[in-house]
Amino acid sequence: MDDWSDYLVCLAVAEAGSLTAAANQLGVSQPTVTRRLQALEQRFGEPVFERDQGQSRLTPLGHKVIAHAKRMREEASAIERAVIAQDQSLSGLVVISASEGLGADWLPRALASFQRANPNIGIEIAIKNNTANLADREADIALRWNGPGTQQSLIGRRGATVGAGLYAAQSYIDERGAPQSVDDLADHACVGWSIGDFFGWPSSISGSAVVPRNISFKANSPASHLKGIEAGFGVGVTSHRLARASSGLVRLLPEFSTSLDLWVVAHETVRKSGRVRAAFDHIIAQMQADSAYFTRGEPSTL
């Protein structure tokens, strides 16, 4: 029988767009990926990819192969989910996906007591600022801002509401002054996101339109975004919990307040596992106990 994993290597190249990116994703060397693809193409008698300046594009045959390879991956993931679901023991590994802002700070502290109470359960935190694919077992549990979404196989519970407001460094205020109304923000430098508005941006006093922004600094991670505000690049919207933990930030225009709901999400089958269900419920309980921390930035209970 042909090696099924060759098809998954082919799928990784198609999704990553290059041999190098696929090798990094799979955790193997580029020559290994090349060798596996060559073996597959030799069996087929024609190429699966066209290679051009380091990029790999699917041939007509390649598109057909990838369609089947995706179904193979889905079925393999379904087998893994079924095996995990029937395991009710409180042992094994639980992989939790979270954004940088949560996974590097609050989540490890929240899980410490869980691991002490369940020493046979190992914890792995996967930092992802994009959405982990729970159906493909990229994680067992995910902390998400948008809930389970429209995928019916996912279940989620809202754990906390994360409040946010306008902040600037004292050094910026000393140099540029503080805005006296949301409309004044049009005359200030702003710290934004390169991945779209995370918490949103104030509308004008009339409410007819969003206040124009002069963005002086952009970032695609919460830590870098916060550092931009701290460094004095301008005014930015950040969560109260991050702002209160930072030195030298001043809240501006407290009448402007916004928030996002933070959800805990899992695949409905995987959540039946004893260890996953226990970790899921623990995270929810810790979020609820820390509601003032998330909503207003008050000291954490952890």
Description of each model-found segment:
Residues 40-41, 249:
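Conserved amphipathic alpha-helical core elements
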Residues 91-151, 302:
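Central regulatory/effector-binding core of bacterial HTH transcription factors
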